[in-house]
From Swiss-Prot:
GO terms for molecular function: adenyl-nucleotide exchange factor activity; protein homodimerization activity; protein-folding chaperone binding; unfolded protein binding. Belongs to the GrpE family. Disulfide bonds: none annotated. Residues 25-35 have a biased composition (Basic and acidic residues). It comes from the Bacteria. Its main location: cytoplasm. One of its GO terms (biological process) is protein folding. It comes from Campylobacter jejuni (strain RM1221). This is Protein GrpE. Keywords: Chaperone, Cytoplasm, Stress response. Residues 1-35 are annotated as: Disordered.
């Protein structure tokens, strides 16, 4: 019986060793799987965080843009008033009363221009060369003093808010 007992103990020891090896292999596999899952979750987190930051930046940019151009329609409507004030200032005056009225209109025009400028409305600077982004060609004329494509005459001033044109400068262009 002692041999049988010895054999059983050896078998039990072998089984115990095999079981420990299997447990260690299982632990390694589980550890590897968990490590892999952790890496995947880290990657997902980083991507989600980057996407969130991009959305946040885009929303901020859209907010700033909306604020910058919120008054665009209103400012565009006021340009007709500006044109009328400029026309009134350009009228020839003969008598003292007309000169005083013209002076008052000029003061009003100056104040009006300052308020428009304060809110980002700016006159489009006169350019010699026709630029379709800033100008609207009303007609083409023959001109000995201008090269083809040059602005000959400004018919109506143009304005912009920041980098957006709210009314192009209306011009005649040399052929």
């Amino acid at each position: 019986m002692s041999e049988q007992k010895q054999e059983i103990e050896n078998e039990n020891a072998q089984n115990s060793e095999n079981l420990q090896d299997d447990l260690q292999d299982n632990e390694k596999n589980e550890t590897n799987e968990l490590q892999k899952e952790l890496e995947e979750l880290k990657d997902k987190y980083m991507r989600a965080n980057a996407e969130f930051e991009n959305i946040k930046k885009r929303m901020e940019k859209e907010k700033l843009s909306a604020m910058a151009y919120a008054n665009e329609s209103f400012a565009k409507d006021l340009l007709d008033v500006l044109d009328a004030l400029e026309a009134a200032v350009n009228v020839e005056c003969q008598d003292e009363i007309s000169l005083k009225i013209k002076e008052g209109v000029q003061n009003t025009l100056d104040l009006f221009l300052k308020k428009l400028e304060k809110h980002g409305v700016a006159l489009i600077k006169d350019e010699k060369e026709f630029d379709p982004n800033l100008h609207e060609a009303m007609f083409h004329v023959d001109s000995e003093n201008h090269q083809s494509g040059e602005v000959v005459q400004v018919l109506q001033k143009g304005y912009k808010i920041a980098d957006r044109v709210i009314r192009p400068t209306k011009v005649s262009v040399a052929k």
